[in-house]
């Protein structure tokens, strides 16, 4: 067996092959059977019920690349144990949209979804409840996630009851360039770093963030590829864009592990 190191073209080809296989496998979408209510934010998310009797916050394809970012960031957050909404793919039928004119803006077909987190603030809030011991690790892991993918804004919500656990949702504007990112935005991005102001505002220290590095270190290249392969092909993310996104995430993971 040769010990020759893999060349970059070989790495790119391997990633591409793995991504294409992951896209082909896909996951069976959860069928949405009822719309509950909606929010008036840019992506116009909707609270809906699935055929599995669970409730989801969904964003349709009319939200553009926001749903790609949302799906990928949520999967990466889950991979390091950060408190994010549990992501999945759902299916919205034309018939269901036709039944309720309030949601006529939704695009039928597959959509991004996260499992609804009940009894939380209905809108995003500023940094809060940092004095709750239960939130220290949660904030630290979110800061690590934000540094890894690059956060253009902060999306914190909190449980209404003590200890007011923090969650991060709505990541459509993450990555350099936000929902309009192009390959060059990722290729030209600076090295990953932790937002020290955010660390300070959360009443943490860099050492608190470093405690999460073993979780980031445990994220395999395969896990990153699976996250990037998750958005269905009809969401418009090309295979070349996916390869660039994998390269971006692999590199930035290494940047942060050097903290």
Residue ranges of model-derived segments:
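Conserved ATP-binding subdomain of kinase catalytic cores across diverse folds
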Residues: 16-125, 148-152
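A generic secondary-structure micro-motif detector
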Residues: 62-63, 135, 235
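Charged, low-complexity, helix/coiled-coil-prone segments
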Residues: 4-22, 79-88, 153, 167-173, ...
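C-terminal catalytic region of ATP-dependent kinase domains
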Residues: 166-259
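Short secondary-structure transition/capping segments
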Residues: 2, 6-8, 108-110, 129-141, ...
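A general structural signal for short secondary-structure boundary/capping elements
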Residues: 94, 156-163, 212-219
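Regulatory N- and C-terminal appendages and interdomain linkers associated
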Residues: 1-36, 51-53, 69, 166, ...
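Conserved kinase catalytic-core segment
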Residues: 125-180
């Amino acid at each position: 067996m040769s010990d020759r190191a893999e060349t970059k073209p070989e790495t790119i080809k391997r990633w591409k092959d793995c991504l294409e296989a992951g896209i082909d496998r896909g996951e069976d979408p959860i069928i949405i059977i009822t719309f509950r209510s909606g929010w008036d934010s840019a992506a116009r998310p909707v609270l809906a019920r699935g055929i599995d009797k669970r409730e989801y916050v969904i964003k349709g394809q009319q939200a553009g690349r926001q749903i790609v970012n949302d799906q990928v960031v949520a999967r990466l957050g889950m991979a390091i144990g950060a408190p994010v909404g549990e992501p999945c793919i759902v299916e919205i039928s034309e018939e269901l949209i036709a039944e309720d004119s309030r949601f006529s803006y939704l695009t039928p077909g597959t959509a991004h979804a996260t499992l609804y987190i009940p009894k939380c603030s209905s809108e995003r809030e500023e940094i809060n409840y940092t004095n709750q011991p239960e939130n220290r690790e949660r904030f630290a892991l979110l800061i690590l996630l934000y540094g890894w993918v690059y956060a253009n804004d902060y999306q914190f919500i909190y449980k209404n009851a003590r200890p007011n656990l923090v969650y991060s949702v709505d990541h459509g504007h993450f990555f350099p360039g936000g929902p309009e990112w192009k390959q060059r935005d990722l290729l030209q991005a600076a090295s990953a770093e932790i937002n020290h102001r955010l660390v300070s505002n959360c009443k943490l220290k860099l050492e608190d963030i470093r405690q999460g590095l073993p979780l980031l270190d445990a994220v395999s290249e395969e896990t990153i590829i699976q996250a990037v392969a998750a958005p269905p092909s009809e969401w418009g993310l090309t295979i070349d864009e996916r390869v660039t996104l994998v390269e971006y995430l692999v590199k930035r993971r290494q940047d942060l592990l050097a903290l």
